[in-house]
């Protein structure tokens, strides 16, 4: 039976490239002259922005978003945390969401069932397996999910015929 997996993954190589580009940009920008500010990737789970003041963090956030979008990373996979101030510095972590959360997976399963497509969807950890008798049914579900407004970006992998 044909099947495919619905996953939410990040291309960490592209995230690293975007962070490097953003670091390069803040070293050359006029409004960041003489300011100690930088981005850093922590444990392939988040990007930490550090600057001297909170308004600079907002500018850094805009720069990072621009670079991530330019690299094809969906901003829905970002989750900004609160700004931490102290010791004449301000920092903010931006979590990168990977893997379908259970609530989101349940929402997708319900959406697939409501579409009356002749497929079965089952949650397998942090991904979703969709199986059906016909390839056309699976492609119909893919189109449905692409057009849906989901909280996380989704990709389709492991398409088997």
From Swiss-Prot:
Example GO molecular function: nucleotide binding
Keywords, ordered alphabetically: Nucleotide-binding
Assigned GO CC terms: cytosol
SUPFAM superfamilies for the chain: YajQ-like
Keyword Nucleotide-binding appears in the UniProt entry: yes
Key word Nucleotide-binding present: yes
Pfam families, sorted: DUF520
Protein role: Nucleotide-binding protein.
Record family assignment: Belongs to the YajQ family.
Record PANTHER family: UPF0234 PROTEIN YAJQ
HAMAP family: YajQ
Name of the featured protein: Nucleotide-binding protein Mmwyl1_2033
Organism: Marinomonas sp. (strain MWYL1)
